[in-house]
Every structure is written in C-alpha cells, then in structure tokens.
Curated annotation (Swiss-Prot):
Gene3D superfamilies: Glycosidases. Its EC number is 3.2.1.58. GO terms for cellular component: cytoplasm; cytosol; mating projection actin fusion focus; nucleus. It catalyses: Successive hydrolysis of beta-D-glucose units from the non-reducing ends of (1->3)-beta-D-glucans, releasing alpha-glucose. PROSITE patterns: GLYCOSYL_HYDROL_F5. Keywords: Cell wall biogenesis/degradation, Glycosidase, Hydrolase. Belongs to the glycosyl hydrolase 5 (cellulase A) family. It comes from Schizosaccharomyces pombe (strain 972 / ATCC 24843) (Fission yeast). The gene is exg3. This is Glucan 1,3-beta-glucosidase 3. One of its GO terms (molecular function) is glucan exo-1,3-beta-glucosidase activity. GO terms for biological process: fungal-type cell wall beta-glucan metabolic process; fungal-type cell wall disassembly involved in conjugation with cellular fusion; glucan catabolic process. InterPro entries: Glycoside_hydrolase_SF, Glycosyl_hydrolase_5.
C-alpha cells in the first residue's frame, strides 16, 4: 500500500490558515454583506434581503463568495508554504431547503441556492495548487456556542438541549459528505466549532453519530470544548472505531492565567512544552490561533517587535512539533490589514513563517534508530513470551511495523511533507495485516514514531 495523493493531503502535517468571513459572516473581518445592525450571518442575510430584496441579496452574497478568496489568494498562501485551509460554514451554506426548514434561515433559503456549488468550485481551485481543505461547521442547529460566529446573535447555545438539533446537524454533515467525495484535497469535516465546556456525554454521542455518516477515509474533526486533554484521551481510546482529530483553539488575549502576563513570560511558558508535550503523536491540531495579546500584556514590554516575533515563533514551534498542524486565524480583512489577527500582516512582518520540508538525501535508517529498534524488539519478545496466549505470536511483525514507519516517514518527505498524524496512519496501515497478531505490527510502528519524535525527526524546526 503506497502513499497516494489523498493520503498525503489528509495525513501530512497541516500548515494552515482560516478563511474567515467567507461562508460564515463575521462583521469585524468583512462588513460587505451588512446593511444594518448586528454582526452575525443571520443579520447579514436578513438585512440584505430587507434592503435589496431576495434576488439582489443572492447576487450580493454570490459575488462575495466568488471574490473574497480567489486563485491569487491561494497562490499567495502556497508561496508562503500554506498547504491547507479551514473554511468556516454553517448548515445554511449547503443550498438545501430541507436543511434550513424550521430554522431562522428558512426565509432566506433562496439566497443560498448556489452556495454549495460555489464552495465546491473553490475547493477545486485550492486543489489546483495542492492546498487541502478542512470544512468546518461553525454554525450548527441551535448554536454550538453563544457567539455571533455560530450564525446568529441569539446569545444562546441550545444545540446541547435538544436531540433534534444534534440529529439535524448529523444530517447536514451527511449531506455535505455526499457532495465532496470527488475532491481528493478535502482533508476532513469539522462537525462543530468551539462547543461549550462540560458537554461531554452529549458531544461524545454526537461525535460518534457524525463519524458514522462520514466516509471512513475522511477524518472527523471534533471541537474540544476547551478541555484538550479530555478529548485527546477520548480520541486515543476510540481510535479503532474511526479517524478523529481534536480541534483545539489557542488564544492568549481572551482569558486564562496568561491573559495579562508580559509577552516574555508567555513565550517562556510556551517554550517549556508543558501545554502540548502530553499530546504528542496524538490526533490534534490547533484549529485557531493568532499573534494577538491583550493591551495589558503589550504595555509590559518596550521591545514590541522582538517580543512579537518571539511569541509567534514559540507558538509555531509548539504547534508543529507536538500537533498535527495549525490554522492561523485569519487570512485577511476587508479594510486594510488586521494586525496580529491577519496572516498576511504577520507573514510580511516576518513574525511567523511556515518551515520548508526537511531534506531527504539520507534514506537509510540512522544507526541510533536501528539500535533502538533492536533493543525494543528484544524487550517486546521477552515481555510477551512470558504471557499466556491463545495463538502463536508473530514477533517479526513488530520489526516490520517499525521499518514501515521509517519508510513511510521518508516517503512523506519525498512528497514535500512531514507526517502529521502517525497514530492514525498506523491504524490505516494495520488494515493490510491479516493476522491475529496485527497488534504487534501496530506496536512496532507506534514505537518507531515515538523514537522518531524523541530524536527530533518529527519536528520541522529542529530536524536532525
């Protein structure tokens, strides 16, 4: 089983950026669609229809969808080594009357008649430059959180209170899944954005239902509800039932113990690796992050430019070393530049830069890694040979798995990428092993990933 192009899109380390205010309106980023009060998608569409009528409103929205992000933007991203984008959308974005029936968006269904068609054209456009696309349900039924970016300004998160809302969101996920199968550059579907904290049982049930309607090859990205470690453990415990990826958002300007800390202290804390060291090799991405700090933080330094660069570099080091990738929030703003929220600003100011892939001249397994393999294999055999077992072991599968990890690591590099989700890749590889001892192959691969990580091979900034 070789590495195909779809595998490369899905399993590589994601150097990403969010395309905010495109299919899910956010006034502070782009106010083109707004004619009255409010800042959410619902207020944008209702105001536009009220001011211009349904047909002209549809023209306005379609003009925005077609022009906000174009091939020149994808070219800019590729030039700056972006290989994936995260596109926020809502259940209203799918151009399906049944999906908006009985919702606040039902009166405006005609505005969204062609939205999915345009979205698919843009997915294809991104694919022409080898950029992957993560489709993110910012807007779910009832609201996944109390913020306007969930689609309305109701201030309510009622998704968790009604089974109907959860089931309808699953139907929306299923419908979207049925429309994107032809695009090899779709890297996943995120089924909810920033769910509120504490809804563990509701979310676990919802995530499993959503997983069941998404094609097995495609990851289901899940919001962590501000409890990263809980959902990383949950995904690790459920990896045999399908490919999940935890979406964690990392901001230092909205709250938490570091919200008002000096930039130097925040950077030092990041550099310790305390926050993400426990998640290494797990299926997790930083779905949103920025270089924004509070005014109180910035007031505590006179070295603004240096601290800004140090902060950006420290974040990238953590997110790309310990996670499967990250997506900066957000790509651009309608009116000028958006400061430390603006990808173009921080790239052009050299605050952050995604790293080029490491060289691939040396394809032979390093002697130190071979030594680790042989030592681990000996320990593996000794341990399991002392145990009662119902069938003969196949210890050679352990070595086969270890060697396969190295070969796959090199193959990703040869395609200009680093592997981002090694545990999930191991699960995929296991499907080719028809043996009751396939677990030995799995353990060999995962042990190899662990040692590759320890030696720095999985860190794009500190690669040997």
């Amino acid at each position: 089983m070789g590495l195909n192009k779809q595998d490369l899109y899905i399993y590589r380390k994601q150097y990403g950026v969010n395309l905010g205010a495109w299919f899910c309106a956010e006034r502070w980023i782009n106010d083109f669609l707004f004619t009255g009060e409010g800042s959410s998608e619902l207020e944008a569409v209702s105001g536009n229809v009220k001011a211009h009528g349904i047909d002209k409103a549809r023209e306005n929205f379609e003009a925005h969808w077609k022009s906000w992000i174009g091939i020149e933007d994808f070219s800019y991203m590729k030039q700056h080594l972006v290989n994936s984008v995260r596109i926020p959308l809502g259940y209203w974005s799918l151009g399906n009357d049944e999906l908006v029936k009985g919702t606040p968006f039902e009166p405006y269904a005609e505005v969204y008649r062609n939205s999915l068609h345009i979205l698919c054209e843009k997915i294809q456009e991104a694919g022409s430059l080898s950029i992957g696309v993560l489709l993110d349900f910012h807007g779910v039924y009832g609201g996944g959180n109390c913020d306007g970016h969930s689609g309305t300004s109701s201030g309510k998160a009622e998704f968790y209170e009604k089974q109907e809302y959860q089931d309808r969101t699953v139907e929306a996920v299923k419908f979207l899944s049925s429309k994107i199968g032809q695009f090899e550059n779709v890297i996943g579907i995120q089924v909810i954005n920033e769910p509120i904290w504490g809804q563990y049982d509701v979310l676990a049930n919802f995530y499993q239902k959503a997983r069941s309607v998404v094609p097995s090859y495609l990851p289901v990205y899940i919001g962590d509800g501000w409890d990263k470690d809980h959902w990383v453990n949950w995904v690790n415990d459920h990896e045999s039932e399908g490919f999940y990826v935890v979406d964690h958002h990392s901001y230092f300007c909205f709250g938490g113990e570091l919200c008002h800390a000096p930039p130097k202290l925040i950077t030092r804390r990041l550099d310790t690796g305390e926050e993400y060291g426990k998640t290494k090799l797990s299926n997790i991405v930083i779905g949103e992050w920025s270089c924004t700090l509070s005014q109180e933080s910035w007031s505590q330094t006179k070295l603004h430019d240096k601290r800004r660069r140090d902060f950006g570099e420290a974040q990238l080091n953590q997110y790309l070393n310990y996670c499967g990738g990250c997506f900066f929030w957000t790509y651009k703003f309608l009116h000028g530049k958006g400061g430390d929220w603006d990808f173009r600003s921080v790239v052009e100011d050299k605050v952050i830069n995604y790293p080029p892939p490491p060289p691939t001249e040396n394809k032979a397994m390093p002697a130190l890694l071979e030594q680790s393999r042989d030592q681990n294999f000996g320990g593996h055999c000794y341990y399991w040979d002392q145990k009662q077992h119902d069938h003969p072991y196949e210890h050679d599968l352990y070595v086969k798995g270890w060697n396969q990890a190295w070969e796959d690591y090199i193959e990703f590099l040869q395609h200009g990428a680093m592997i981002g989700f090694p545990r999930a890749w191991t699960q995929k590889r296991m499907t080719s092993i028809s043996s009751a001892s396939a677990w030995e192959y799995r353990d060999g691969m995962n042990a190899a990933w662990l040692h590759l990580e320890r030696m720095g091979f999985l860190n794009p900034f500190r690669h040997p």
